[in-house]
């Protein structure tokens, strides 16, 4: 049988042609409750609609492709199918048991999942990081094993250096990979990210924003009206005024109020303890 090019060279080279053709493998029927997912697999989010669609297909046609597990029944390949079978309330499923130790099983499971096309950028980046840190992979070795370019792997590995809040924005498609790359190791990455999102900047504008920051053009003139040139840092000159305003607002609303001020904007935060306090705030605002 012809090899499926979508798998790349990694999984097929590790597991052999059994990944593509299972004719020579012994398929066993196992109670689904004995099977467990791999906790180290990079995919963290499974879309319910897609799992439900697969579950409906399994109910109508059965599970056409066995799940691959290790000696401890930990999934190496096929977690989506396993989840769909659970959803469809299938009691027993076909599996192929691979004679692998825990380390080999984990490595192959990671590679199999990373090679999928529907991982998010951050899921792929975290998978690369795990392989580098736990299996001594280099960028070159990963590129060869996964059939990806070294630059792609290097760029994604660097995304792991971003603050968690920005990684989450990338994962949720609020920020693109190109925008996020501009903020790696930036002192005020989170503030910059908020500005990029609120002003709907594209990648080129984001690159220019960061370039201007590092050129320190934002300090040349206190009256600089260029959006790219404005300061992001807190304006200490207004601290006294803000403290007075915080005091007035706290007394007026009877709760803790804080203000985070930046030259490009800021946040006015009301800290309420329960819904009754929230209702009072809304009543006074109206």
Swiss-Prot record:
One of its GO terms (biological process) is positive regulation of sporulation resulting in formation of a cellular spore. It comes from the Bacteria. InterPro entries: Chromosome_partition/occlusion, HTH_ParB/Spo0J, ParB/RepB/Spo0J, ParB/Sulfiredoxin_dom, ParB/Sulfiredoxin_sf, ParB_dimer_C. SUPFAM superfamilies: KorB DNA-binding domain-like (SSF109709), ParB/Sulfiredoxin (SSF110849). It holds the Pfam family ParBc. The keyword DNA-binding applies. Keywords: Chromosome partition, DNA-binding. GO terms for cellular component: chromosome. GO terms for molecular function: DNA binding. Involved in chromosome partition. Localize to both poles of the predivisional cell following completion of DNA replication. Binds to the DNA origin of replication. Belongs to the ParB family. PANTHER family: CHROMOSOME-PARTITIONING PROTEIN PARB-RELATED. This is Probable chromosome-partitioning protein ParB. The gene is parB.
């Amino acid at each position: 049988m012809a090899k499926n090019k979508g798998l790349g060279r990694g999984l097929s080279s590790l597991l052999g042609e059994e990944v593509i053709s299972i004719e020579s493998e012994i398929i066993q029927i196992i109670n689904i409750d004995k099977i467990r997912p791999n906790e180290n697999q990079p995919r963290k989010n499974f879309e319910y609609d897609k799992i439900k669609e697969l579950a409906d297909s399994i109910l109508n046609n059965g599970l056409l492709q066995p799940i691959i597990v290790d000696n401890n029944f930990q999934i190496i390949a096929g977690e989506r199918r396993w989840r769909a079978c659970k959803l469809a309330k299938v009691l027993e499923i076909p599996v192929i048991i691979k004679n692998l130790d825990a380390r080999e099983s984990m490595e192959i499971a990671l590679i199999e999942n990373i090679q999928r096309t529907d991982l998010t950028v951050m899921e792929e980046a975290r998978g690369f990081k795990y392989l580098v840190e736990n299996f001594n992979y280099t960028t070159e070795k990963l590129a060869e094993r996964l059939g990806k370019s070294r630059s792609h792997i290097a760029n994604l590995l660097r995304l792991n250096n971003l603050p968690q809040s920005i990684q989450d924005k990338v994962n949720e498609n609020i920020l693109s990979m190109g925008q996020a790359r501009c903020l790696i190791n930036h002192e005020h990455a989170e503030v910059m990210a908020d500005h990029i999102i609120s002003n709907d900047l594209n990648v080129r504008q984001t690159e220019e924003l960061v370039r201007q920051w590092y050129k320190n053009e934002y300090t040349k003139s206190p009256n600089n009206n260029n959006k790219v040139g404005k300061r992001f840092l807190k304006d200490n000159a207004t601290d006294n005024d803000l403290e007075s305003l915080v005091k007035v607002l706290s007394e007026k609303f009877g709760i803790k109020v804080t203000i985070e001020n930046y030259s490009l904007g800021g946040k006015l935060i009301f800290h309420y303890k329960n819904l009754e306090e929230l209702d009072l705030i809304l009543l006074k605002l109206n």
